Amino acid sequence: MITKISLILFAVLLVSGLEEEERWKRSLQPGAPNVNNNDQPWQVSPHISRDDSGNTKTDINVQRHGENNDFEAGWSKVVRGPNKAKPTWHIGGTHRWRRSLQPGAPNINNKDQPWQVSPHISRDDNGNTRTNINVQRHGENNDFEAGWSKVVRGPNKAKPTWHIGGTHRWRRSLQPGAPNVNNKDQPWQVSPHISRDDSGNTRTNINVQRHGENNDFEAGWSKVVRGPNKAKPTWHIGGTHRWRRSLQPGAPNVNNKDQPWQVSPHISRDDSGNTNTDINLQRHGENHDFDAGWSKVVRGPNKAKPTWHVGGTYRWRRSVDIPHASTDNVDETFWEFDPHTEDDDDKPVLRLRRSDDEDEEEEEDQPWQLNPNIARGDDGNTRADVNIKRRGENHDFEAGWSKVVDGPDRAKPTWHVGGTFRW
């Protein structure tokens, strides 16, 4: 009976349009105020579908987004097919508020509600009813997050899981007037965290990060301190250094980036006891990108030969630059010359390009790009591949070729060619 009633409700809702959303104001009186500049804080989304296994599934979701409160609920059921079963559902929401209730309490980061709580309850396909609640606070120098979850009914009923963590941001230099770095007052931040998972393991971890103008740093430590998977800790240390290849004063910026080159060394220890070292080198230029990396397990049960990769990208227009070109024998209705002078050369260069209006409206100056790459993997195979792409206004094109040139899986190459036409 309940199933029949639900199907009737779906039929009524779907009259206005299948798989569409209906949004409305709960208050229909003229002049009802907007909430967060949204005219429709409430919305309902009915849906019905049939999958590859022959199951017909119906579901409906209701949402409301308000100034201080959010609400969400949903119901889903396979009404016909081999997987027909009891429905699943969920109900939850979020409430935001200030910890200080005094009038005139200051905003933090332009947020009126630094605190928020989100309770939730749901039933899954296995018949488990799960409840959980999360509390968050986002402040100027500190963030906090805690959560609790438990299967209160069903075959997987067990002890609850939980987590507590946060982030503290600060300057390494505590002197008054210490300069901002990249418009960030706190280049340093530390994030401690502790949690308990479904297997009964209690894990603690801490991460430290610094984001600077030319250097980034990151380090972390994690350990299961209690439970069946208690073991030695894991850790990682790494960073990034950015610099110009040209060290002369006044070297030009590339794509508004002062440091087109960057190197990122890293070392870590995983759960299996392997210590892995790797280093990556990248360059991002106007017409060229370059990427290379090297990685090796230097200690542990999986110690082996290193892996590596080298690749890049070249972007260009289909019509290339022609130095000292003339306009003789050129169809002016289809082609035009664009005078162009290089910064490091007084000789004029004429760029040949299509004179179509859409050429000037293209967001990218180089719709074509070529990506060669070669790499060696953990299995000892050295693979070479090359890809070519073009992104146009109405047409996209892509082609690629790949081959294992050395190693146990050496074989004939693979390739692909495809595209997209929009109209």
Swiss-Prot record:
Job description of the protein: Acaloleptins A1-A4 show antibacterial activity against Gram-negative bacteria but not against Gram-positive bacteria. Acaloleptin A5 shows antibacterial activity against Gram-positive bacteria but not against Gram-negative bacteria, and may also have antifungal activity.
Propeptide segments, given as residue ranges: 18-26
Pfam families: Coleoptericin
Region (Disordered), start-end ranges: 28-58, 108-128, 180-203, 355-385
Biased composition, class Acidic residues, residue ranges: 357-366
Gene Ontology BP term (one): defense response to bacterium
Record-linked InterPro entries: Coleoptericin
Compositional bias annotation for Basic and acidic residues: 376-385
Listed GO CC annotations: extracellular region
Signal peptide as annotated in the record: 1-17
UniProt record similarity statement: Belongs to the coleoptericin family.
Keyword Transferase set for record: no
Species of the source: Acalolepta luxuriosa (Udo longhorn beetle)
Domain of life the protein comes from: Eukaryota
Protein name per the record: Acaloleptin A
Keywords, in A-Z order: Antibiotic, Antimicrobial, Cleavage on pair of basic residues, Immunity, Innate immunity, Secreted, Signal
Tissue expression summary: Hemolymph (at protein level). Larval fat body.
Polar residues biased stretches: 34-43, 180-189
Swiss-Prot/TrEMBL induction comment: By bacterial infection. Expression detected 2 hours post-injection, with expression increasing until 48 hours post-injection and remaining considerably high at least until 72 hours post-injection.
